[in-house]
Structures are given as structure tokens and as C-alpha cells.
Amino acid sequence: MASIIFSAKDIFEQEFGREVRGYNKVEVDEFLDDVIKDYETYAALVKSLRQEIADLKEELTRKPKPSPVQAEPLEAAITSSMTNFDILKRLNRLEKEVFGKQILDNSDF
């Protein structure tokens, strides 16, 4: 991971040599002020994210690890729902068979 070369204070205290045809000092200072604000914002964001990572890691260590026993009720529920679905399909076929014949018998009148 790359290390940070400049801090906000380093940027603020940086001095530049002066030449006759140099940059506008006020513009450079304003730009560097904005860069300092960005550095401070990024530093605060990094600190906040590191704290959040630490909190989440701590929360993860406090939670109990899931055991294989917990998977069994889920498998039972899936099997049960498949069984219920099969029963409903069978009931549907039987109803069609019974009520379908009644409809055909009633249409003969």
C-alpha cells in the first residue's frame, strides 16, 4: 500500500520560489487551500471507515458461528413444502376428475 507523502500541514507550509514570470500567488494559495480541505476530508473519511471496519470485525467476533444443526429445520421446511405442493397437485387432479365428470353428466340434460 502506498504511503501518504504530504499532510495537510505540509501543503499549507510549502513555500515556492519566486520568478518574474511565475504563477499568480493568490491563485496558487487558493488552490492549495482547496487541496488541504480535500486532504482533511479524506483523512476524516479514512478514519471513519477504519473505525467502521473495526466495529464490524468486533461485531462479527461476538456473533455465534452458525452450526450445521441450524440447517436441518430449513431442509425440513423445504421437504415439507415440496410435500404440500405434491399434495396440492394430486388434489387438483382429483378435483378435475370428479368435478369434470359432474360437469359432463349435468350437460346431458
Swiss-Prot record:
Stretches of the chain forming a coiled coil according to its record: 36-63
Descriptive protein name: Cell cycle protein GpsB
Subcellular location, principal: cytoplasm
Organism name: Streptococcus pneumoniae (strain ATCC BAA-255 / R6)
GO BP annotations, alphabetical order: cell division; peptidoglycan-based cell wall biogenesis; regulation of cell shape
Biological function: Divisome component that associates with the complex late in its assembly, after the Z-ring is formed, and is dependent on DivIC and PBP2B for its recruitment to the divisome. Together with EzrA, is a key component of the system that regulates PBP1 localization during cell cycle progression. Its main role could be the removal of PBP1 from the cell pole after pole maturation is completed. Also contributes to the recruitment of PBP1 to the division complex. Not essential for septum formation.
Record's keyword annotation contains Coiled coil: yes
Family per record: Belongs to the GpsB family.
Top-level taxon of origin: Bacteria
Cell cycle is among the record's keywords: yes
Keywords: Cell cycle, Cell division, Cell shape, Coiled coil, Cytoplasm
A Pfam family reported for this protein in Swiss-Prot or TrEMBL: DivIVA
Assembly description: Forms polymers through the coiled coil domains. Interacts with PBP1, MreC and EzrA.
InterPro entries assigned: Cell_cycle_GpsB, DivIVA_domain, DivIVA_fam
Gene: gpsB
Lineage: Bacteria, Bacillati, Bacillota, Bacilli, Lactobacillales
GO CC term, one of those recorded: cytoplasm
Subcellular location: Cytoplasm
